From Swiss-Prot:
Localisation: Endoplasmic reticulum membrane
Region (Disordered): 159-257
Membrane topology, record value: Multi-pass membrane protein
Segments traversing the membrane: 1-21, 42-62
Coiled-coil annotated spans: none
Record GO cellular component, one term: endoplasmic reticulum
Residues recorded with modification Phosphothreonine: T196, T250
Name of the protein in its database record: Receptor expression-enhancing protein 4
Annotated InterPro entries: TB2_DP1_HVA22
Keywords on record: Cell cycle, Cell division, Endoplasmic reticulum, Membrane, Microtubule, Mitosis, Phosphoprotein, Transmembrane, Transmembrane helix
GO process annotations (BP): cell division; endoplasmic reticulum tubular network organization; mitotic nuclear membrane reassembly; nuclear envelope organization
Its job: Microtubule-binding protein required to ensure proper cell division and nuclear envelope reassembly by sequestering the endoplasmic reticulum away from chromosomes during mitosis. Probably acts by clearing the endoplasmic reticulum membrane from metaphase chromosomes.
Residue numbers of Phosphoserine PTMs: S152, S194, S202, S253
Originating organism: Bos taurus (Bovine)
Length: 257
């Protein structure tokens, strides 16, 4: 564990940070010799990192594996050994120049295929999204149509006519029992008030009321005075008729006597 931590620290500092700063100095000073040197180093170091990914999985159990890796990185970087330049000139450059055309064709094919695959995946994704949207819309329309169909008149007619449910408190059941009023004309003993009535009126039946008379026009001031003046005459006539009737009734009584 300690050797692994030390190895990672050495690779980070001496394999990446210091060469990056040296490359910056070479670009700034426009020193072609240093520029070529650090370019060869970065090519070799990139291949080393690619190989390290697999060796850490399969050969990490080998004794002194991390120590050998640290020594190799220092050997590549050292200005005395110049291991990166030597590996590049003897192995990397000849192999790359030998398979350069094949590598270029593979890169071009990979670009074209990647472009085609991206387009195909994009089309498939759009088709899947469109189909999902259509299915969701059809489902929502079906649900809405079902709800509207449930509110049709045919379904409403099939609903049984019954009393509306009422809430009953279990603690006060006696107080909540509705007491029906007895019908009008019904006595406690089961007899009716009048024998002529064939039916008993209940509290739910409404007695028909006479139609309202049309509202008469208000009398004028002169008409009201005439009516007031005529009233005493009507009373005198009635009193005279009463006197005549009483006299006629008393006359036969005198004759009998």
């Amino acid at each position: 564990m300690v050797s692994w931590m030390i190895c990672r620290l050495v690779v980070l500092v001496f394999g990446m940070l210091y060469p990056a700063y040296a490359s910056y100095k070479a670009v700034k000073t426009k020193n072609i010799r240093e520029y070529v040197r650090w370019m060869m180093y970065w090519i070799v170091f990139a291949l080393f990192m690619a190989v390290e990914t697999f060796t850490d999985i399969f050969i990490s159990w080998f004794p002194f594996y991390y120590e050998i890796k640290m020594a190799f990185v220092l050997w590549l970087l050292s200005p005395y050994t110049r291991g990166a330049s030597m590996l590049y000139r003897k192995f990397v450059h000849p192999s790359l120049s030998r398979h350069e055309k094949e590598i270029d064709t593979y890169i071009v094919q990979a670009k074209e295929r990647s472009y085609e695959t991206v387009l195909s995946f994009g089309k498939r994704g759009l088709n899947i999204a469109a189909s999902a949207a259509v299915q969701a819309a059809t489902k929502s329309q079906g649900a809405l149509a079902g709800k509207l169909r449930s509110f049709s008149m045919q379904d409403l007619r099939t609903i049984p006519d019954g009393p509306a449910p009422t809430y009953q408190d279990p603690l006060y059941l006696e107080d909540q029992v509705p007491h029906r009023r007895p019908p009008i004309g019904y006595r406690a003993g089961g007899l009716r008030d009048s024998d002529t009535d064939n039916e008993c009126w209940s509290d739910t039946e409404v007695v028909p009321q006479p139609p309202a008379r049309p509202r008469e026009k208000p009398l004028g001031r002169s008409q009201s005075l005439r009516v007031i003046k005529r009233k005493p005459l009507a009373r005198e006539g009635t009193s005279r008729s009463l006197k005549v009737r009483t006299r006629k009734k008393t006359a036969p009584s005198d004759m009998d006597s």
